[in-house]
Amino acid sequence: MYINSGYLNNPRTDFKDNSTPLVVGSCGTYRLKTRPKLPTYRQKGRRDYQILYVANGKTHFWFDGREEIVSAGHMVLYKPEEIQKYVYYLEDNPEVFWIHFTGSDVKNILAYHGISLDEHVFYCGVLPDYKVLFRKIIQECSCAAMGTRTILHRCSTIFCCWWTASSVNRKKPPAMSKSKLNARRLTSTRTITQRSA
């Protein structure tokens, strides 16, 4: 199994931090090579939020006791203290990136980017940019000297890309040019950064 991950604090404990609007606690990726399956079951969930991006293959998730197979190009969102049950199978060739985050303004930040807390699975597309962003966040979580502003910028970029792709998937194309989308991303990053200062 291939694992690459970075942690802001202790990797064995989740945490809740309301001292700033958004804090990334950890980020990583899993890819099965020989292990037949990798199950995760958190009956009480975690204290933070989690996004999982299925970059390749498919994964099996359970929401409200029902199995849902999630294919490449989708992100899954878990809220704090929500039951988490999912399994990666070798035969499905899964490559999954994940990020755990917390903060005093997470709900508003997600809402600003059009990400509903009432849903779990969102289409966002299979883009190499996502892998690049996640890998950079992993690296930055591993190097505390990099600071949090860069990580916040990358999270904001992920949220903006997610919002754009999910809007298109809902048959509601965003009424924004590329320059307006970039301006929205910059505004979002500035807002998060200012609130963190």
Segments predicted by a language model, with ranges:
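Amphipathic alpha-helical segments enriched in hydrophobic/aromatic residues interleaved with Lys/Arg
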Residues: I109-A175, L186
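Short, charged, low-hydrophobicity "junction" segments
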Residues: M1-N9, V106-I109, V132-R135
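Short, locally clustered residues in the helix-turn-helix/winged-helix DNA-binding domain
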Residues: A55, T164, T189, T193
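DNA-binding recognition helix and immediately preceding turn/loop
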Residues: P174-A197
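Hydrophobic packing within well-folded, soluble alpha/beta domains
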Residues: I51, V70-G73, F159, R184, ...
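A short, N-terminal "cap"/entry segment at the start of jelly-roll beta-barrel domains
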Residues: M1-V23, E140, S166-V168
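N-terminal regulatory/effector-sensing and dimerization cores
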Residues: N10-R12, S19, S26-S116
